[in-house]
C-alpha cells in the first residue's frame, strides 16, 4: 500500500493539465513551484505572504517590484499610473464612466459580450453612444473603425481589444480622432508588445494571462486621475484614491499581486513580450 501511494504521488507531480480555459488559466509551473517553496516562510520572514501585513516592509517590496517589472515589460511611461485593484474587469465597467465621464458622454465600440456589458453599464451614468457594433452577425467580425462617427463631446472611446468567445481581435486600433482610448485587454494582456501611449486607460483582470483571480490591473494616464468624478462616486471607486495610496488604500489582493509579480519576472526571464 505504501509503495502504491508513493508511486501515485510521484505520478501526480508530473500529471499537469494543459488548461486552455479562458480564465482562470494555466500558470507557469516554475512560478507555482517558487510560490510553493515560499508558502510557509517567505524569504526568512517566518510567515507566508498570505499572512503578512500589506503595510510591512516585506510586502512593500513585493508590490513595488511587481510594478517595476510590469513597467519594464510594457515600457510604461512615467506619466502613467499602475494600479493593482479588486473587483475584476467587470467593476471597471462602472469605474470608467464614474471617473472619466466629465461631459457625461462616451462612445463605445461593441464587438462582444464584454464590450456590450461595459456599454450597458455606462448607460447608467451618462450618454453612452454605440458608434460601431458587430452584433448584427453574432460578433463574428471587427467593424471598420477607420472613420467612426466620434461624438464631438465624447470623454473617451471604449473597446474590448480581444474577444475570446468569438475569436476576434482588433488588429488595428480604432481612429479615435484625438479622443482618449480606453481598452479592456483582459484576454490579451502581456501577450505581445503594446504602445501604451496610444491609450488613456488599459485594464484587465489577471486570471486569463497573468495570475490568480481577484486582481485587476489598471494602467491609466495621470491627467485622467482627478477629483472631478461623477457625484456620488464612492471613495473606493475613485482612481485617485488608489493612485494617491500606491494601491494600498485598503488591504489589496496581496497574494494575487505576489503571484503576478512572479509571472512578470518569469516573462522577463523568457525574453519579454517580444518573445511571447
Description of each model-found segment:
Residues 1-13:
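Short, Lys/Arg-enriched N-terminal segments with co-localized hydrophobic residues
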Residues 23, 122, 133-189:
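Active-site phosphate-binding strand-loop segment of PLP-dependent enzymes
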Residues 16-67:
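A glycine-/small-polar-enriched, mobile loop at the entrance of the PLP active site in fold-type I
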Residues 28, 206-276:
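Active-site C-terminal subdomain of aminotransferase-like
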Residues 182, 196-207, 216:
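Conserved active-site segment immediately N-terminal to the catalytic lysine
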Residues 46-92, 99, 113, 121:
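Conserved N-terminal alpha-helix of the aminotransferase class I/II PLP-enzyme fold
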Residues 90-157:
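PLP-dependent aminotransferase-like
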